[in-house]
C-alpha cells in the first residue's frame, strides 16, 4: 500500500497573490498598483482592490516605536508590515502551493496536506480549512463551498480558527478525528444541534435522523450510534469527503488499521478502517469502489457493518 506523506509546509507557502505577512505596502503596490480604496489610522493601513480581475483587502500594521517591536516576558512584540490579506475573487491570483479560487477541495488537501482545523458554518454550509505555519504565527484559511475554494485569507492565528493544539500528522490521533459532522458516538443526541433535520426513519428500536448532507443513527436511549455522509458537500475533521480518491484519504490519515476487501465484481467495494484509541469499538470507515478507488461512503460506526456490499445495509437502513 503506497501512502504519500505530505511534505512539511514552510513559511514561503503562506502567501496570497505573492503577499506574505510582514511584507511592506510598497511591495503590495509593486504587485497590484494603486488600490481602489485607501484608509490609514494610527496603527493600521488598509488597501482595498476592487476590479474586474481581483477583489482583495490588505491590512498592514504601521511602523511604531522600536521598544514596542521587542518581545518581552509578558507580551509579544508588534510585527509591522502586512498583517492580513483577504481574497474574494481573482481567477489568476495564486496562493499557497499553486492554488487558485474555484479549485476543488481535494486539490487543496493534496497540495497543502492535513488541515490543522476544519470548521463548518452550518447555516451557510461553508467549510473553513485552516492551515497554520510551522512558527504558529500565521494561518491560511480557505472557505470551501460546493466542493470548491471560494475565498482565502492570510491572517494571524486566533480562535476559533486556531485550537492551540499540536499540528495533526498521519496516524497520530485526537478525539476530534473520531467525530463526524460534530457528533461523537455514544453521546446524547440533540436533533437540531447543527442543522434542521429533513427526514426521520425508524428501524426496529432505532431512529435515523437524515439531514441534507449526513445521517445520524440514534438508539432507544437517545445515544448516537452511527454517523454517515450522504453527499460530497460534507467533510471529515481532516477534510476528506465522498468522491475523493483513496490515495488522498491515505495521505490525510495514513495506514488504516485494517482493510476489508470486497469480491471481484463490477460494483464491489472495499472498506478502510481507522480504529479509535479513545472509544473501544468505534471506527471511522471509508468505503471505496474496488475498481475506481474513489470513496463512496464515509461512516463513523460503533458496531460492525453487516453487509458491506449493500449501500443501504451499510447505513443500517435496509428494509
Task: Give the location of each predicted region.
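A cross-family detector of function-defining hotspots
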Residues: 5, 23-81, 89-161, 179-221, ...
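N-terminal low-complexity, Pro/Thr/Ser-rich intrinsically disordered segments
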Residues: 1-18, 161-187
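Structural motif
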Residues: 86-88, 227
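Second-shell loop/turn segments in exported
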Residues: 12-19, 91-99, 176-182, 233-240
Amino acid at each position: 500500500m503506497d501512502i504519500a506523506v505530505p511534505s512539511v509546509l514552510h513559511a514561503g507557502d503562506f502567501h496570497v497573490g505573492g503577499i506574505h505577512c510582514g511584507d511592506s505596502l510598497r511591495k503590495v503596490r509593486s504587485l497590484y498598483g494603486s488600490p481602489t480604496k485607501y484608509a490609514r489610522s494610527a496603527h493600521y493601513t488598509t488597501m482595498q482592490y476592487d476590479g474586474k480581475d481581483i477583489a482583495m483587502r490588505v491590512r498592514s500594521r504601521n511602523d511604531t516605536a522600536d521598544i514596542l517591536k521587542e518581545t518581552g516576558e509578558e507580551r509579544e512584540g508588534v510585527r509591522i508590515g502586512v498583517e492580513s490579506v483577504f481574497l474574494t475573487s481573482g481567477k489568476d491570483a495564486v496562493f499557497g502551493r499553486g492554488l487558485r479560487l474555484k479549485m476543488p477541495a481535494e486539490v487543496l488537501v493534496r497540495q497543502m496536506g492535513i488541515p490543522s482545523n476544519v470548521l463548518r458554518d452550518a447555516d451557510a454550509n461553508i467549510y473553513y480549512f485552516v492551515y497554520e505555519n510551522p512558527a504558529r504565527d500565521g494561518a491560511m484559511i480557505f472557505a470551501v463551498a460546493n466542493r470548491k475554494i471560494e475565498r482565502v485569507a492570510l491572517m494571524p492565528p486566533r480562535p476559533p480558527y486556531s485550537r492551540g493544539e499540536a499540528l495533526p500528522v498521519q496516524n497520530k490521533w485526537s478525539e476530534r478525528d473520531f467525530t463526524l459532522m460534530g457528533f461523537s458516538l455514544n453521546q446524547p443526541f440533540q436533533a437540531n444541534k447543527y442543522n434542521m433535520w429533513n427526514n426521520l426513519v425508524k428501524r426496529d428500536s432505532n431512529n435515523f435522523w437524515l439531514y441534507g448532507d449526513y445521517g445520524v443513527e440514534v438508539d432507544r436511549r437517545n445515544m448516537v450510534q452511527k454517523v454517515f455522509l450522504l453527499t460530497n458537500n460534507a467533510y471529515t475533521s481532516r477534510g476528506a469527503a465522498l468522491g475523493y480518491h483513496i490515495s488522498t484519504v491515505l495521505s490525510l490519515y495514513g495506514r488504516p488499521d485494517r482493510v476489508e476487501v470486497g469480491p471481484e465484481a463490477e460494483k464491489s467495494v472495499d472498506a478502510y478502517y481507522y480504529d479509535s484509541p479513545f472509544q473501544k469499538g468505534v471506527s471511522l470507515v471509508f468505503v471505496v469502489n474496488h475498481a475506481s478507488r474513489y470513496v463512496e461512503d464515509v461512516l463513523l460506526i460503533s458496531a460492525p457493518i453487516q453487509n458491506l456490499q449493500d449501500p443501504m445495509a451499510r447505513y443500517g437502513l435496509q428494509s
